[in-house]
């Protein structure tokens, strides 16, 4: 067996006095490289081979070694050289079986502790020279205390382990004696950063220790160094069971219980780790931790990992530390860091049988010997069995005989007689089986009712979704989904930023538990879709807004139909996603309306709005305005859902948006009216229930074609005599009253509250535009329309419709509109003016790039179709009055077919083109995208519309 090892390349024979050195070199590439790099060490070993007496006393020797250095570059070089020399010596001791396994990992731990403290002390002196000395309020010097976690704290460090550290200092304060005073927190942060660099940075000399700071409070998101008070607050208020588990092995490096700071820190942490009562609640937390590791083993194919695999080191630690967490508060003999020292106490307390303790101890030593040999080969942190014959031979040689301590703490030789790698594996499997049996007896795997592939996948997501999420772990999970490799980084950064931000929020225990269950569902579902990059940021934004509102999180987690619906909405509409994120109260719609996609009837908008506002006092105007916006957003959401789910056709979508706007206009007028009447009284010419005021809608609202982002084109009219006035104590003229009413209506619409702006209102279509009065009498309006209006203003009147007013005022406006539209016009002049106006619009509005088509402004688009409809009305209404009846384009084309103005083919073709293009605009509105598409879309519709346009306007020029 031993003959398989390679001793070539060195001037050494495999016999005699050089045999131990040959064994050390053959067993470890690291030792060989260290001897090649450090000639003085090689010379020392050739004069005198390492012995047990050479081990230890690291701090004193290192102090001498560092006494001559002047800067951090030299510090880095010396630390690495010293570490490599001592590690090579311990590898020699291990390879030649000169000491017990326990001795080796105790020495590895002592070496690490000495190096860390020496580096800290040297850097502390340097930082004091640069920044001053940190002191508390009493002027007492404040030290940096370092807590060693894991195997370092338990004095069980393996050969090439990383080190888990937590930095802390006693009290806040400032530095003294430096060029510039800085806070203690800043001083210790800088010191900590320089210490990590001194240990962790890979230089030409290698590294000292891979340094992991993620076990500190808040992990990577937390401060690098915390005061005692901040640490105490964290562990009392936010400390979790896995942190208690980790703290079992915590040790203050350089521990000195005569030091008041050391005593205080230890007394502060002990109650967090060890509860005064039997803490059976820890079992489930530990079980969940183990299940998480088991899933990681499967996910990363780590079954051969001697640390994480079944029956490995981690399960042995779980068994022992579970007893420590449950019983350690009451049975203080369990409050020890070393696993091997705790085992006999578990037997004394009848928590383990002697045989169980022996099986666990033997398996632990066997695994630790195997782990150390594996890592000593190349100074690499590995726990996976090798596949090559050379390294397998090294392992078999090291593990077929080794020393361990017996029950009397005396060296005991353990021997195996393997002839093959399979025999070694059989012994390993036997140890692991012993551990596995005990683990299942004592802790076990709680029966999982639904171990379906989906639930397994959700569990894996739950494992990796934490503030310290790792990109490689995420990539391993994403490989099971139809996610492009080039998108992995985008998803990682999105998740990392989100999860880190959430970790700093006061979410509470209940909320965090719900989030931990919800997020795996979200990620599994979204990553299973093709539009994951669209949906994920939008849905995360919604969840982000409700992280501190646990009720909403529970709604998303518990109601199975809501999350898929939200994902679908987010995929189809950024507008909807942003509305829900901005106003989370819209999620109430999902609770109240189980059939959210069923919108109400048109006539119900007014009655529902009235009922919605009843609960708010009339005098609370701000609350009323807020409620109006909430009502609009809630129903806008329901309409959008119906649109996205295909419940309503495009024409009905616009109808609902139009009726919703009309209901809101009515309530806005009511609010403004009551406010004005309360201040000034009402115009005296009015009867009891009259207001003498009308709101005329133009554009898309007038044409019953409102879109999601449409503004409201409004004109205000009244029927008051000019000489009249109001009836209040502060009487004003009728004109002033209606002017103030119009201004008040405008201010309500445009007021920006926490619920957003109600509607953008455009009043430029009133007589004389911006130069005209904000509100006109019916008589003045009629005169202007029939004697002064430009052709484009009369075109706009085609889409005019009274959306608020008494029946008599609605009739009056309809009469004015009808008589105006039915005036006879010269065909040639009319077509020329409309064509010229369209040409001006095209020149000023169309800025579409090559290869694109603007659905609204480009030739063959919506504007051309609208102009065709308006042209037909203005040209033929004097002959066919029914052409003046409708304000919407579709019914205008229907009337034109019925009157014989358009053929069935042309009329239906225009309606089809109009509705299809409108539908596409709706879709783009939902995505908050401009109304621009690729010019390969709507080719036939554009050609048809352009052909009709030319027939009407070009061929007749």
UniProtKB/Swiss-Prot annotation:
Q: Which cofactor does it need?
A: Mg(2+)
| Region called Adenylyl transferase, residue ranges | 454-957
BP term (GO), one: regulation of glutamine family amino acid metabolic process
Q: What is its EC number?
A: 2.7.7.89, 2.7.7.42
According to UniProt, the reaction catalysed is: [glutamine synthetase]-O(4)-(5'-adenylyl)-L-tyrosine + phosphate = [glutamine synthetase]-L-tyrosine + ADP; [glutamine synthetase]-L-tyrosine + ATP = [glutamine synthetase]-O(4)-(5'-adenylyl)-L-tyrosine + diphosphate
Report if keyword Plastid is assigned. no
UniProt keywords, alphabetically: ATP-binding, Magnesium, Multifunctional enzyme, Nucleotide-binding, Nucleotidyltransferase, Transferase
Name the InterPro entries on file.
Answer: GlnE (IPR023057), GlnE_rpt_dom (IPR005190), NT_sf (IPR043519), PII_UdlTrfase/GS_AdlTrfase (IPR013546)
GO-annotated cellular components? cytosol
Molecular function (GO) terms for this protein are: [glutamate-ammonia-ligase] adenylyltransferase activity; [glutamine synthetase]-adenylyl-L-tyrosine phosphorylase activity; ATP binding; magnesium ion binding
Enzyme kind, highest EC tier: transferase
Q: What does this protein do?
A: Involved in the regulation of glutamine synthetase GlnA, a key enzyme in the process to assimilate ammonia. When cellular nitrogen levels are high, the C-terminal adenylyl transferase (AT) inactivates GlnA by covalent transfer of an adenylyl group from ATP to specific tyrosine residue of GlnA, thus reducing its activity. Conversely, when nitrogen levels are low, the N-terminal adenylyl removase (AR) activates GlnA by removing the adenylyl group by phosphorolysis, increasing its activity.
Family in the record: Belongs to the GlnE family.
Q: Write down the HAMAP family for this protein, in alphabetical order.
A: GlnE
Q: What is the name of this protein?
A: Bifunctional glutamine synthetase adenylyltransferase/adenylyl-removing enzyme
Question: Which lineage?
Answer: Bacteria, Pseudomonadati, Pseudomonadota, Gammaproteobacteria, Pasteurellales
